[in-house]
Amino acid sequence: MNIKTLTVSEVTNYIKRMLDNDFILSNLSVKGEISNLKYHSSGHIYFTLKDSSGRINCVMFKSNAVLLDFPLEEGMEVIIKGRASIYPATGSFQLYCDEIRKEGLGDLFIKFEKLKEKLSKEGYFDEAYKKELPKYPQRIGIVTSPTGAAIRDIINVSTRRSSLVDVVLYPAKVQGSGAYKDIISGINYFNRKKSVDIIIVGRGGGSIEELWNFNEEELAKAIFNSKIPIISAVGHEIDFTICDFVADVRAATPSQGAEIAVPLSDNIKDRLLDISKNLDKYISDRLDTCRNNLSGAQRILKVHSPMAKISNSYLEVDRLQDRLNFAMRTKIKGEKNKVENLNNLLFAHNPIKVISKGYAIIKDNENNIITSKEQLNEDKNIEVILKDGNIEGKFIPSK
């Protein structure tokens, strides 16, 4: 039996025609849980529809996506109306969705919501417990896979932003059973060593199953108990994990985590320049204040110094001595004037001066001055004092 050899395109086109013409596959209603959700920039939506034992890739083109009245979410249980076909360029089987309606929440999403509610009630998400990131870290610890895109993105962004910050990697599994224990070990390692200023925990995007290790309660508590601030940088912007809520800062992607953690070199230089200027001004102001205080102290010291007091005492002694000399001169002059006045008065009443004018003083033999004839008896001895000498005689009354 001869079998015709077909090209790849012939095979894929044949299968596509078979599927497109199949009554059941061309008008399907399928129930499942959304996983690996991606909103494309073109407006198309790509995701995987899964249940406990199977999965199908799905696409909803923009023309139908704009009619959705709710946003699709990881773990959401939905019913899809559409058709099954293959994409000839890749030969991949997929569902082309015309309509999507909510059916309920998947098991993982329900588990996620329950843990989120539990931890929220216990205070693990409270802003009061969020640690502030240091503005100018020197070393940043990274807990992620050493071979994934996340570490490459973090290193590239960090290097571009600043050469002053060191990046230290703790290699950890970020996917698969028990990977969260590796991540916890990395957090504990950096806390034990105290060798970094910030920790970034992260990985690239993925389905809810692939990111599930970042929804484990043990990891959430390890992040909460870390003494070092932690940035959660898990998945893409639309991906949210428990780690995002409990971490001190949430970054939409690993690259954004590096941008948050690492300051630009220019900003650091500008900050250092500002600090230098402020320090110069502070030192200059302090020196001016010290100079003014020193000048004031010198003035006070000059006024209250012992030498100043001695100098003032010398001046006071000189002043008092001048006053004393003046008082003595004034007193002496006054006394001289008194003596001179008394002398003049004495001279004016001097008997010699009276005698010199032609008068005489008569004394009896008992040296009494005779001022009246009644004091004399006949033949009584007398002494007459004249200007140029004394004369003795006897008193003879006139007849």
UniProtKB/Swiss-Prot annotation:
Assembly and binders: Heterooligomer composed of large and small subunits.
One of the GO BP terms on file: DNA catabolic process
Organism the protein comes from: Clostridium beijerinckii (strain ATCC 51743 / NCIMB 8052)
Keyword Nuclease attached: yes
Lineage: Bacteria, Bacillati, Bacillota, Clostridia, Eubacteriales
Membrane-crossing residue ranges in chain numbering: none
Family statement: Belongs to the XseA family.
Superkingdom of origin: Bacteria
Record localization: Cytoplasm
GO cellular component: cytoplasm; exodeoxyribonuclease VII complex
Official protein name in the record: Exodeoxyribonuclease 7 large subunit
MF term (GO), any: exodeoxyribonuclease VII activity
Reactions accelerated catalytically: Exonucleolytic cleavage in either 5'- to 3'- or 3'- to 5'-direction to yield nucleoside 5'-phosphates
